[in-house]
């Protein structure tokens, strides 16, 4: 949830209803109101409803529920003479801009709105940063987004003298908080007029030159970041809310210097989401019609049409919470009112049962214990230096370097355990079952979760045969007659390792640990290890059922 503080009288004046009615309607929008004092209220808003983070956004939604305005809001949009030239900025490559004229806003609320967007879609300015300037104080019609050296000087916000960017990083609170996000190789991103004067260094601080005050009605807005989609969404959210405050949106021509591409900003992109009548009925348990569904969609301030029997919802870009059909159904439920949805008397006669993978993992653990192994449990996170494959998920901001990667095998964890228990009574037989994250180019992220089991023996004298026998027993007990094919890798001794196959499908690896690997982990005794791919085993066993 995101919390905002608003003047209740200003908000109520925009929608002309009483406070209790306001609270009831906000509850329908999954928001809660708490009084602070005579004049102010605190509103908790769902973190995905970024369009509701200002009084104007809230007023827009409530006008729909009151049926004072239906469908997507229509705003005055005009072309301007302003141009933003986007140069090659390596740390934050994307930028868009817009102008808003004659918006009647509360300055304190606008700053709150900006910071709430920074904290949500902006990921504390790492993903998106917003600069809002007094348009009267912008001298140039051509603005450039580019890299500048840290020796560049300007007067930062609320300061009265010029500072270099280096000094801003050292002396100002904003510089200390956000300087590490975008500064690299001795340069900083900057929004600069064509005369060279700096308007801002995103995501750190604006220039004092374009500082907002209570008389500001015309705005120049820049949005920069690491994701073009997030930059476009953020700008659309801001300008649409300012337009609700009576503003006229001015388009800015955006030129990409690298490839000479050109676009008009803000983009005002829309997407079409088809909604099935039967799906709405099933999810909400109500009797309805296509026309009734469209009416509720319009009350939620989106356009809706019925074409050839298909309900087509037009989703504005500032509704970042609408990802698929179920999100539209949720909006319909909010329009109806959750209190108006009657619970159905449904008694389930089904009983819960364990997932097949859970049962298989339990069986493998029981077989491991029966074979004389002691179960251990390691963390899923591991130090990247202990991994054998360079294809792994790296933690971006680890709390400690000891846990800066996600394991892609259980073997490093077992070896680490053996290295710390060489004083224990021999032989040491241990095993572990658990999740790993492995490279998979066919997935949208490039990685997938995999379930595995690994077994290890350490003794004064131990060989391949010592580990093969119990592994063969475990697999045979599962109903798999496997074969072993000699296959070398960097973990095991050449000629003393194999891959485990079942009907030409690889089920795991097994072998004597290479002395170089033992030295790397500080192990002074020989060890043998096997790792089974439970996910692959499950597929085979499922096919046999």
UniProtKB/Swiss-Prot annotation:
<keyword id="KW-0963">Cytoplasm</keyword>
<keyword id="KW-0030">Aminoacyl-tRNA synthetase</keyword>
<dbReference type="Pfam" id="PF17759">
    <property type="entry name" value="tRNA_synthFbeta"/>
</dbReference>
<feature type="binding site">
    <location>
        <position position="321"/>
    </location>
    <ligand>
        <name>Mg(2+)</name>
    </ligand>
</feature>
<keyword id="KW-0648">Protein biosynthesis</keyword>
<dbReference type="InterPro" id="IPR004531">
    <property type="entry name" value="Phe-tRNA-synth_IIc_bsu_arc_euk"/>
</dbReference>
<keyword id="KW-0436">Ligase</keyword>
<dbReference type="GO" id="GO:0006432">
    <property type="term" value="P:phenylalanyl-tRNA aminoacylation"/>
</dbReference>
<dbReference type="InterPro" id="IPR045060">
    <property type="entry name" value="Phe-tRNA-ligase_IIc_bsu"/>
</dbReference>
<dbReference type="Pfam" id="PF03484">
    <property type="entry name" value="B5"/>
</dbReference>
<comment type="subunit">
    <text>Tetramer of two alpha and two beta subunits.</text>
</comment>
<feature type="binding site">
    <location>
        <position position="331"/>
    </location>
    <ligand>
        <name>Mg(2+)</name>
    </ligand>
</feature>
<dbReference type="GO" id="GO:0003723">
    <property type="term" value="F:RNA binding"/>
</dbReference>
<feature type="binding site">
    <location>
        <position position="330"/>
    </location>
    <ligand>
        <name>Mg(2+)</name>
    </ligand>
</feature>
<dbReference type="InterPro" id="IPR005147">
    <property type="entry name" value="tRNA_synthase_B5-dom"/>
</dbReference>
<keyword id="KW-0547">Nucleotide-binding</keyword>
<comment type="similarity">
    <text>Belongs to the phenylalanyl-tRNA synthetase beta subunit family. Type 2 subfamily.</text>
</comment>
<dbReference type="InterPro" id="IPR045864">
    <property type="entry name" value="aa-tRNA-synth_II/BPL/LPL"/>
</dbReference>
<feature type="domain" description="B5">
    <location>
        <begin position="268"/>
        <end position="343"/>
    </location>
</feature>
<dbReference type="GO" id="GO:0004826">
    <property type="term" value="F:phenylalanine-tRNA ligase activity"/>
</dbReference>
<feature type="binding site">
    <location>
        <position position="327"/>
    </location>
    <ligand>
        <name>Mg(2+)</name>
    </ligand>
</feature>
<dbReference type="GO" id="GO:0009328">
    <property type="term" value="C:phenylalanine-tRNA ligase complex"/>
</dbReference>
<protein>
    <recommendedName>
        <fullName>Phenylalanine--tRNA ligase beta subunit</fullName>
        <ecNumber>6.1.1.20</ecNumber>
    </recommendedName>
</protein>
<dbReference type="InterPro" id="IPR020825">
    <property type="entry name" value="Phe-tRNA_synthase-like_B3/B4"/>
</dbReference>
<keyword id="KW-0067">ATP-binding</keyword>
<dbReference type="InterPro" id="IPR022918">
    <property type="entry name" value="Phe_tRNA_ligase_beta2_arc"/>
</dbReference>
<keyword id="KW-0479">Metal-binding</keyword>
<dbReference type="GO" id="GO:0005524">
    <property type="term" value="F:ATP binding"/>
</dbReference>
<keyword id="KW-0460">Magnesium</keyword>
<dbReference type="InterPro" id="IPR009061">
    <property type="entry name" value="DNA-bd_dom_put_sf"/>
</dbReference>
<dbReference type="InterPro" id="IPR005146">
    <property type="entry name" value="B3/B4_tRNA-bd"/>
</dbReference>
<dbReference type="GO" id="GO:0000287">
    <property type="term" value="F:magnesium ion binding"/>
</dbReference>
<dbReference type="InterPro" id="IPR041616">
    <property type="entry name" value="PheRS_beta_core"/>
</dbReference>
